[in-house]
């Protein structure tokens, strides 16, 4: 039997994204939301859904906006006062993320999540950066605080979450012809038994 969990990531990215996620949650489409705590619209987004019955995760972000900790402490992932862009990560042939630095930022975002929400995240994961050091840093911080780490998969291989194999499909949202409905249909048609 196919089981699909549809997660809306990037709560906090902007007010427009926040309103879209709020609507999808309140219409019953989404019950799993990834929260970016480092953005200007973070608290706005949280306030829109804080009373909803939703699984809220810490969606750790190192490629858009300003970091939570001092940028001078994390030069491998910042450019000036902002994070390096996702384009810089994608175009690099090597992992330039320094593990010790990214752990500082991951920890800071975890603490900011607790400050804003007053609770632990229901799960812990990262925002679409294919960096082994970023993923390792997420695992280290998750283990340090006994958090449910949901992992990241960029090649279609399943990740283990709560002893359950989960297949992730983000679709290619940067494509000029991206169609979320078509992506959803393809995702369902290609889904394997178990969680997708």
Residue ranges of model-derived segments:
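Active-site beta->alpha N-cap acidic-glycine motif
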Residues: 2-65
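Active-site mouth loops of central-metabolism enzymes
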Residues: 3-14, 91-103
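Hydrophobic faces of well-ordered beta-strands that scaffold small-molecule active sites
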Residues: 4-9, 31-35, 56-58, 122-124, ...
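Short, acidic/polar
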Residues: 14-22, 102-112
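Acidic (Asp/Glu)-rich catalytic clusters
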Residues: 21-27, 43-55, 72-81, 114-117, ...
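Non-cysteine beta-strand/loop elements that form the S-adenosyl-L-methionine
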Residues: 55-62, 79-85, 196
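Active-site gating loops and adjacent loop-to-helix segments of metal-dependent hydrolytic enzymes
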Residues: 67-97
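Catalytic domains of cell-wall/extracellular-matrix polysaccharide-remodeling enzymes
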Residues: 107-167, 171-182, 189
């Amino acid at each position: 039997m196919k089981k699909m969990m549809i997660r809306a990531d990037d709560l906090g990215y902007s007010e427009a994204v926040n309103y879209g996620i709020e609507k999808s949650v309140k219409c019953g489409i989404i019950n799993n939301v990834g929260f970016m705590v480092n953005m200007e619209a973070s608290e706005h987004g949280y306030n829109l859904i804080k009373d909803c019955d939703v699984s809220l995760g810490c969606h750790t972000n190192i490629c858009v906006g300003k970091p939570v900790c001092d940028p001078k402490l994390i030069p491998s992932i910042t450019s000036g006062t902002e994070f390096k862009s996702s384009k810089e990560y994608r175009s690099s042939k090597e992992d330039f993320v320094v593990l010790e630095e990214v752990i500082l930022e991951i920890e800071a975002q975890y603490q900011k999540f607790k400050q804003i929400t007053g609770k632990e995240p229901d799960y812990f994961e990262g925002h679409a950066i294919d960096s082994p050091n970023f993923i390792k840093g997420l695992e280290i911080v998750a283990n340090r605080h006994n958090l449910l780490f949901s992992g990241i998969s960029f090649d279609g291989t399943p990740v283990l979450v709560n002893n359950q194999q989960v297949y992730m499909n983000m679709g290619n949202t940067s494509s000029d012809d991206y169609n979320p409905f078509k992506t959803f249909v393809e995702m369902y048609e290609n889904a394997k038994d178990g969680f997708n």
